[in-house]
Design a protein with these regions (language model features):
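Short, basic/low-complexity N-terminal boundary segments at the transition from targeting/disordered tails
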Residues: 1-18
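Unusually extended, aromatic-enriched hydrophobic runs near protein termini
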Residues: 5-9, 26, 30, 76-81, ...
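Generic alpha-helical secondary structure signal
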Residues: 7, 38-41, 49, 53, ...
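Low-complexity, intrinsically disordered/propeptide-like segments
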Residues: 9-12, 33, 67, 87
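Generic cytosolic/nucleocytoplasmic N-terminal low-complexity/intrinsically disordered segments
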Residues: 12, 42, 58-61
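Amphipathic, interaction-prone secondary-structure segments
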Residues: 15-50
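Mixed-charge, Lys/Arg-enriched low-complexity segments
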Residues: 55-101
Length: 101
């Protein structure tokens, strides 16, 4: 999956994007990071809570993907390092089959 596809899923507020997780392949511990979308909140886009102290939330997908909250860099900045684990709580491999990627 490329950056534009994942960003578009969040920007269009697609179903089943909450609890999306990934790690950075440059991290030897492969620590998981979480992002998601919960439409019932004023700031529906979120990151962290388990990996970012006190979590982080915002109003738009653009803010989420461009915020320098991952060691001073954004998802957009670090895209080439990202390994997707799951999207919407579904393993990425299974998700690709279900969504024909």
């Amino acid at each position: 999956m490329n950056y534009e596809t994942l960003f578009d899923l969040f920007d269009r507020k697609c179903r089943n994007i909450d609890e999306t997780s990934f790690y950075f392949k440059t991290d030897p511990k492969e620590a998981e990071h979480y992002i998601g979308y919960l439409p019932q909140y004023e700031k529906p886009y979120w990151a962290g809570y388990c990996d970012i102290e006190n979590g982080w939330d915002c109003k738009t997908a653009k803010e989420l993907f461009e915020a320098p909250i991952f060691d001073g860099k954004s998802i957009k900045d670090r895209w080439d390092e990202i390994v997707l684990i799951q999207i919407g709580g579904i393993s990425f491999d299974e998700w690709k089959i279900d969504y024909c990627l």
